Amino acid sequence: MKIQNMIKKIMIAVLSAAMMLAPIVNIKAASTDVVDTSKTGSITIHKYDMTAAKQAGVNTSQFTPTGKQDAAAEAALEKYAIKGAEFSYLRVGDVEQQSENGKIQMIYELPTTIQQILGLTSSDAAKTEGSKTYFTSQQINEKLAKALEDNTVTKDKLEDYMGKNGTAMDETNANGVTSKDKLPLGLYLIVETKAPENVTYTINPWFVQLPSTDSKGDDWFYDVICYPTVSYTHLTLPTIA
């Protein structure tokens, strides 16, 4: 099975300064490999203290996001696992293929509220079908990246939206890991909804596509592994000299 050279990879890493996040992809040519819609998917998240890792000399730039397990990254970062972080997930819409000018691309449904939060308008839509509006990955990526650049307003709105509509995953364990399986296929919004007491910042939200594919385009995979990162500021008690 090979769909290489048919995929333009757009990494979600650009959305949230995150490392090794699953890609949303555009398929630019017809593929004989089809998604098995009878399957479900899973999302696994690894949470690490990248500030401490970098200070200890770990070269985090050596790790490339693929959406698949990276044993080397896990081994290098295991000492910096964050326990007690809570992530929430929400299936925000369907993923469909759209043919245009002899090419096929993936398009993604987003609910009206998320469109408004990201600043997407009807003129940005790649397709409208009844009450459903679809956008390309490039549109979603660019809008989210821009909205998260300068302030926390967008992040706060997405966290609030997730608090009202999302489902919390189990808190990360001692290895910094949490996961959820048996998820219907589609586009998911992931938000960190609770940080441990000694951490002052949460990771920026990101999207995950189920199923996904990596840059090689060998096949579709239904179990996506995310390694989001952020620089933490740890709370410390003041000392009196």
Predicted region positions:
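Solvent-exposed loop/turn and edge beta-strand elements of beta-rich ligand-binding domains
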Residues: K2-L235, A241
